[in-house]
């Protein structure tokens, strides 16, 4: 699909070349992904999903915790069993805390990327029709990701107290572990959609960059033909001034250009 992709990319570039306001609006949306942390998004696409430790015990322990609390008014000694279950759940909770925190940055970037993709889709940039379904699927993943990386606000005492009780509830009933397992499952199921949205944003960014480059320098566009044939007339490097123009014709043959570093191969 190399030729088809190149032609589609050319049409996208033309769209932004003709509409400077659209390019400026999209550039503003894309600017929220300029931080280096944005690279963390690719971890959700290409890395092997983390495995929740001791997950086979999570649901039975959660049911036991609920049962012992319900029985406590009638059998107070059941609170001792609840404390034992709480200790086990505490170990499971913090055994998985590292995995949860490792996904924190990637999840933040997923939310930013989803917001950016939605804004690009509203502008109806090239590729929007295909990306719409992918954006909808990623939104489902993003909703399940909100538990990941949630931390207390130590700067606010009231918020810290509230967070402490929330954290205790998460531990007692394995809430964070269960939600994290569902989040990992949604990533695995929607990985292609995340990748598609990632490409949609990247291709839009690249098309805007190429459109800007074409407006600032002298460039040309290839015309594809069948067969092994290449003809280039008066070719110069687009980013280096003072290059000697070269004409090249290859018909059914190849060309190997050699030379040491900084010897002028690109010019």
What is each stretch, according to the model?
Residues 1-263, 267:
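Alpha-helical coupling/stalk and coiled-coil linker elements that connect catalytic or binding modules
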């Amino acid at each position: 699909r190399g030729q088809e992709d190149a032609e589609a990319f050319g049409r996208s570039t033309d769209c932004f070349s003709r509409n400077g306001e659209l390019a400026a609006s999209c550039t503003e949306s894309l600017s929220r992904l300029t931080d280096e942390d944005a690279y963390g998004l690719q971890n959700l696409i290409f890395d092997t999903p983390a495995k929740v430790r001791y997950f086979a015990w999570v649901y039975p322990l959660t049911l036991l915790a609920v049962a012992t609390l319900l029985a406590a008014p009638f059998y107070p000694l059941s609170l001792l069993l609840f404390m034992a279950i709480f200790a086990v759940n505490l170990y499971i909770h913090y055994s998985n805390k590292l995995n949860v925190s490792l996904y924190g940055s990637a999840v933040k970037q997923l939310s930013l990327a989803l917001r950016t993709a939605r804004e690009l889709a509203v502008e109806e940039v090239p590729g929007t029709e295909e990306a719409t379904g992918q954006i909808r699927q990623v939104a489902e993943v993003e909703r399940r990701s909100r538990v990941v990386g949630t931390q207390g606000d130590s700067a606010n005492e009231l918020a810290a107290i509230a967070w402490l009780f929330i954290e205790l509830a998460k531990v007692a009933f394995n809430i964070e572990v269960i939600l994290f397992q569902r989040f990992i499952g949604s990533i695995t199921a929607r990985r292609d959609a995340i990748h598609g949205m990632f490409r949609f944003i990247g291709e839009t960014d690249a098309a805007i960059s190429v459109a800007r480059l074409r407006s600032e320098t002298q460039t040309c566009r290839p015309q594809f033909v069948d067969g092994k044939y290449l003809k280039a007339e008066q070719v110069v490097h687009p980013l280096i001034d003072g290059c000697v123009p070269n004409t090249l014709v290859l018909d059914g043959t190849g060309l190997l250009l050699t030379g040491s570093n900084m010897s002028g191969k690109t010019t």
